[in-house]
Amino acid sequence: MNLAVDTKKNDHVIEVKVAGEIDVHTAPALRDELMPLAEEGKDLKVSLKDVSYMDSTGLGVFVGIYKAVNRTGGSLVLENLSERLIRLFDITGLKDIIDISGKSEGGL
């Protein structure tokens, strides 16, 4: 299972692009990459455009990241979600907690 994380820091925003699969094997590495960024107190924008699969362990990572950015005064926006990922956040109720309104794939 492959996972790639690319990070770009600006003054108040950290932009992250995630590519690959987020599952039980890759979620710990993703958490290890994102948690220090979340604790900087900046706004965190995470593009999931190139994420081909995510399971519940991936959701758990984003819940933890959401809590960390809120503790430090930042915000979390997930961008470019596929229809499959939007549905995953919808059926779990997390779309009402985590902002997934960033640019959606397909212009939604």
From Swiss-Prot:
* Domain STAS, first and last residues per copy: 3-108
Modified residue annotations for Phosphoserine: S52, S56
Cross-referenced PROSITE patterns, in alphabetical order? STAS
InterPro entries reported in the protein's UniProt record: Anti-sigma_ant (IPR003658), STAS_dom (IPR002645), STAS_dom_sf (IPR036513)
Gene Ontology MF: a single term: anti-sigma factor antagonist activity
Residues carrying Phosphothreonine? T57
Q: What the entry says about post-translational processing? A: Phosphorylated by RsbW on a serine residue.
Cross-referenced Gene3D superfamilies, in alphabetical order? STAS domain
Top-rank lineage group of the source organism: Bacteria
Which Pfam family, any one of them, does this sequence belong to? STAS
Alphabetical keyword list: Phosphoprotein
Please give the family membership noted in the entry: Belongs to the anti-sigma-factor antagonist family.
What is the role of this chain?
Positive regulator of sigma-B activity. Non-phosphorylated RsbV binds to RsbW, preventing its association with sigma-B. When phosphorylated, releases RsbW, which is then free to complex with and inactivate sigma-B.
What is this protein's name? Anti-sigma-B factor antagonist
Q: Which organism is it from?
A: Bacillus licheniformis
